[in-house]
């Protein structure tokens, strides 16, 4: 299979899975394994196409991101979504990522560990659906600092490949009495700084694997993931309120079973 086709396929996978509760990292590892596209070059490629998904969220939520630069609501202690909410949502995952980054990259980026993460994340999502109570926050401006921190702590689970950042944070939001839409939007916003930081760190460590010859492949993957992520996020927000997390959880379990039976055994 040509590099361009591989880039196109993985770009679609990244764009679809990055902000859906199905684990983009897990899917990239599993699909990369099936395509025979693995190793350091593959890891560097994954970093680049994640930037495409990051750019999609930055554009979709640019007004909200710009508003976070206004510190007046924070200084006046207004009950309005502000930068401190984002800090509380990001800080736990940053600490966990810095402490565990090398261990995770060395030992956990394997197909069998992803299968475990897919199932564990699915169990959390089903648990959140069963145990969720009536929401008290229906918009980002309703979000309390305690709810933001709770969601941030759940984001730490996403350092394990296959668990899913969106799945973890949206589940945490439901358990903290945040509705689907608000939990999803907050999940997207706190994913940005974490992804930028993690991607930047990975890029610094992987830049030696970049080659001028790889530019066409990387460009196709980047552009594809950007376009697909834009479409996926808009569609997901509309879909989630109708169907909830359970269908995504069942898909994760089915994928884990099929991959184990047909590939790992």
From Swiss-Prot:
GO terms for cellular component: plasma membrane. It is found in: Cell membrane. Keywords: Antibiotic resistance, Cell membrane, Cell shape, Cell wall biogenesis/degradation, Hydrolase, Membrane, Peptidoglycan synthesis, Transmembrane, Transmembrane helix. The keyword Membrane applies. GO terms for biological process: cell wall organization; peptidoglycan biosynthetic process; regulation of cell shape; response to antibiotic. It is a multi-pass membrane protein. The chain crosses the membrane at residues 4-24, 42-62, 84-104, 108-128, 184-204, 217-237, 245-265. Signal peptide: none annotated. It holds the Pfam family BacA. One of its GO terms (molecular function) is undecaprenyl-diphosphatase activity. Its main location: membrane. Its EC number is 3.6.1.27. It comes from the Bacteria. It catalyses: di-trans,octa-cis-undecaprenyl diphosphate + H2O = di-trans,octa-cis-undecaprenyl phosphate + phosphate + H(+). The keyword Chloroplast does not apply. InterPro entries: UppP. HAMAP family: Undec_diphosphatase. Bacitracin is thought to be involved in the inhibition of peptidoglycan synthesis by sequestering undecaprenyl diphosphate, thereby reducing the pool of lipid carrier available. Catalyzes the dephosphorylation of undecaprenyl diphosphate (UPP). Confers resistance to bacitracin. Belongs to the UppP family. This is Undecaprenyl-diphosphatase 1. It comes from Bacillus anthracis. The lineage of its organism: Bacteria, Bacillati, Bacillota, Bacilli, Bacillales. The gene is uppP1.
